[in-house]
Every structure is written in C-alpha cells, then in structure tokens.
Amino acid sequence: MKILKTLYTATLCAAMAVSTSSCLNSWLDQSPADGIDAETAIKNSDDLANVRTGLYAAVKGNSSLINYYGRLMFVYGDMRGEDIQYEYNGGRGRANFYYYMEYTTADNFTTSTAVWQMPYVVIARANRLIQAAESGNLTDAAEAKATIDQYDAEAKVLRAMALFDLTRIYGKPYTVDQGSSLGVPIATSPLESTEKPSRSTVAQCYEAIEKDLTDAINSNALPKTNEVGYVNLWAAKALQVRVYMTKGEWSKALSVAEDIISNSSYKLWEPSEYVAAWSKSDANHSKEIMFEISINNNTDWTDREGIAYLYADKAGASPGYGDVIVTKDFSDMLTSDPADIRNDILLAAAAGGFDKRKVYINKMPAVNGDVRYSNVPLLRLSEVYLSAAEAAFQAGDKNKAANLLNDIISNRTTDESKQVTSGNITLDRIYIERRKELVGEGQRYFDVMRRGETVTRYTDVNDRGWHDVLSEEARTFNRDSKKALPLIPVGEINANPNIEQNPGY
C-alpha cells in the first residue's frame, strides 16, 4: 500500500526545484517522498524513529513551509483578534493578510496564507507511523515494544492536534450547531490513489480527535517526564483540555485540567522567573512549558520566515522583520497594572514611536543574539489554569474559579488588589486575564470563535490607536461575519472535487 503524502506544493517543489504552480493540485499524491512502500521503508524501531523525526519536523516546517506552527498558525490565531496588529509602517508583509482581510476568492488562499498544507502533512506522516507501529511486522516488535508504543501514542496526539486545528479554522465552532456543519476531510490511515475524501462534519472531526487523544492517553505509553520538543502525557492532556473548551464541555475540561495541575510536575512561573524563563537556556524554562517546537541548529529552523523573526523589532538588538506589534488597546489594558510582570515581556521599539510604549512581543527571545534559534512554545501550564478557571465558572463553581484565577494573578502581579473573590469574579475578568497571558501565542481568535465574542479593532478615528485605516469588515467582526472562516485553497478543491468549499465572500 502506498502512503498518503499530502506534501503537495512546497514539499514537492523544494525537492524537485520546479515551479509552485505545477505542484498545486496533488492533494492525494500517493508516493512517499522516497518512492518506497511503507512495508519496505519501515522495518524496525530505528526506521520508526526516523519517521517520528519527520513527523515533528512537519509540525515545525521550514523556511519554505511556514503554514502551520512555523508561522501561520500564530499569525492566524492572533492577527484576527484585537490584541495584535500588523506594523504597517515598517513590516515586511508576512503578517498582513489576516489583518487587512482583503481576500475575496479562494485564489487568495495559498501555501503562504492558508493553514492547510502542513497540517495534512502531519496527518499523513502520523498515519504512516501508526500503521507501521501497529502492523506487528517490525523486526524488533517484541524487544522494542515500549518505544514503538510511545511513538505510536505520540503520533496519535499530533494527528489529533492537526485535525483539531484544521477543524477549528475551516469549520464553524462546535457550539454554533453542535457540530452538524462541515469540518474537514478525515484521514486515519494511508489512502489509495483513487480515494478522494469529502469533508466530514465538525462533530465527526471531533469524534476522531477525541478518540486519538483518549487512545494515546489511555495507552500508558506516553512518558510523564519532559523531553524538549516532544509530547508527553501532560501535553496530550493539555491539548485535550483545549478540545473540551472549544466544545463547551466544561466538566470534562475542568476534570482534566485539575488532573494536570495536581499530578504533573509542571508549575507556574513565579514573578521573579517569568521574563527570563521564556529563554530556552533559562533553568526555569521547562517548568511551565509543556510542549514546544525545538530549534537546534540552522538545518531545522524556519530561518527568517518563522514566527520569532516576525515578532522581533527590525531595528532591535536581535533584529527581525518587525511585522507584529501589540495594539494600543492591548497596551492600555496591560499597562493599567504597572506591577504586572507581563509588561516586561514586551520590548519598546528601538526606533521610538508608539508613545514610547513597549510593543514587540519577546516570548521567543534571541539565543546568542539570534531569534531564529529560539524554541516556539505550543502548550503551557498557564493556559491550563485559565481554562480551568473558565470551565469552573461555567460549571457554576465561582469559588473554585476564583482560586484558579488567583493562582495566575498572584504569579503575575504584586498588586494584591487585582485578585478576585467568588463574589466579584466574572467571565469578562477571566477573559481579560487570558488575553494578557496568552498574547502572541495564537489563541485569541479561537477564543473569540468558541465564545461568540465580537472583535472590535477600532470604531472611528478617535480610537484607532496604532492601526492602519481598515475597511469596515476588518474593523469589527464576529463568527457570523462573512469572512469568519477562510476559504479552502483552490488548488485543493481542484485536486479533490469532493471537497466542498466554504461559502464565498
């Protein structure tokens, strides 16, 4: 059986040095990159380890493949909100697509603007690994069982993550219609060349996502200890919390979150640790970060196309493109508490401007003067606490919600008056704390979508702040707006006519 290889455009083009346009419609190209059948390519656990390496590499991408967590997942998740904006006076055009929202047809969504290609590469590679691991045909299946089972479980977690991300980007929020609308195509095994799957419903996608996560967690094969760059049991559970929150399943989200908080070795960064701990070389770095993309050298980075380079001030000591800054509204919100240590995770523009405020996000700080070597955080314990607080509130336990939120607040500000009680805690207060904590981590728009909030970047010239002039549809929008969902790249529709397009603009 040939392996599903949804490497389409950029992967094929990089390998074959041919034009991008010639590679656009190969959604179900079945030949593996080396042209070898799975049965021949993966003989033992060492071969499986190589596939595992390729699986994690697909999550990261490279300088030509940035349409997942290499860059675009963060840009999509934050640039569509109100806390982050494009720096239009000096940015290099890497983060403006979802800021201006000027796209009109599926032709506008390409490998550089649409989160589609690389998540399916992740799924394809996960399928390949899982099939081999569970085939029973590996020559060292007995003696290497623990290792094989671990890799199998990791692949299921990453397959779930990729399908989850695709579903929440291209499908309506589950809470809108309980998942009855269209999600994305599901592939849980290598496909034959004649197979062209249609879009499953959002509910069916979540069923597959939850099954993968449950199977991986219940396998007892995932380690509890931290290995930088790889998922473990607690990272899988943190992703599970994110899934339950997106579905509005508060009791489930709270139960898993409390398990992580009580039983894992991860702890919140303290105020004295917070700023320095973002550096991967800091002793406290792994205290709170549960899963991150690991950058080891210039052969496995995203170079100047990665998210860290977009966040770095173009005129700073460790320069980047400077495409992304926080908005004035966000700055107002954060600086309203001068004692909040999160003020210091932002850097002022070296060239001045912005009322001399700090605007550049420094959550991926330079390593030896170069931001390209920074690791990229994907799952943190802070998010688990914030989700637990929100879930507890939604489940009716305001006392527990207040205690959980205060765990965050007390570790971020020395101003005790900012703490909450069961009598004054509100959902809005939880949401504000979430925005302050997770800015730049690609979460804001997904929170907007799942909660049915409205994004208001500005209303008129008087509150425009540092924004460029935006169209009305880019100034204020919600999940019912016509551009709430992106269009599926036209090349994918052409390659697989069974994929139904999202409503046009």
What are these regions (language model features)?
Residues 1-22:
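Sec-dependent bacterial lipoprotein signal peptides
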Residues 23-78, 311, 315, 321, ...:
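Membrane-proximal, proline-rich intrinsically disordered regions
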Residues 38-39, 66-87, 166, 171-180, ...:
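Short, surface-exposed recognition loops and adjoining beta-strand edges that mediate ligand/DNA contacts
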Residues 45, 52, 60-61, 204, ...:
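Extended ligand-binding clefts on enzyme/binding-domain cores
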Residues 92-170, 218-222, 371-376, 395, ...:
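Conserved, well-structured interaction surfaces
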